[in-house]
A protein has these predicted regions:
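Short Pro-Cys-Gly-centered "Cys-loop" motif that presents a nucleophilic cysteine in a tight turn
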Residues: 1-148
């Protein structure tokens, strides 16, 4: 790995700075995040069809293939009483455009690695972790000016 780091002018570990995560409220936020993740290759212009992207779980969530490594989330299972109804409901969700506001919110929570969900969820995370789980402003507070 040291040779690769020298060759490419990198420092640190190979995965340093690449992995980001945030806690997600199960209610409706899980499916919003599913859509965000599975539509990322489309936004990045890697594919026109998210189900065709090799490293995506989209084709499994649409019932087009089985993947033994995936465990369906209860929110996804609640989309329908059988696999066909779930697949159709998920296809409808994927076809709905994500609002710019939702995209920005997910990106900000992910970048800051903060809890994404309703206020009650963030309050619960605050209480259990004894740490602030909300979004912080992107600027540093000004220092008070010296008094003459």
């Amino acid at each position: 790995m040291a040779l690769l780091s020298v060759r490419h002018g990198r420092t640190g570990t190979l995965w340093e700075g690449r992995y980001k995560a945030c806690l997600v409220d199960s209610a409706d936020y899980v499916l919003r995040c599913y859509r965000y993740i599975e539509l990322n290759p489309v936004r990045a212009r890697l594919t026109d069809n998210p189900a065709a992207y090799r490293w995506s779980s989209c084709s499994a969530n649409l019932g087009q293939r089985r993947h033994s490594a995936l465990t369906p989330h209860p929110c996804w299972l609640a989309l329908g009483s059988d696999p066909i109804k779930r697949s159709n409901a998920y296809r409808t969700l994927l076809d709905e455009a994500l609002s710019d506001e939702l995209l920005a919110s997910i990106r900000l929570h992910l970048q800051q690695q903060r809890a994404l969900g309703h206020d009650a969820f963030r309050a619960m995370v605050d209480a259990k972790t004894r740490r602030f789980a909300g979004i912080r402003p992107a600027y540093r507070p000004r220092k008070p000016s010296p008094v003459d």
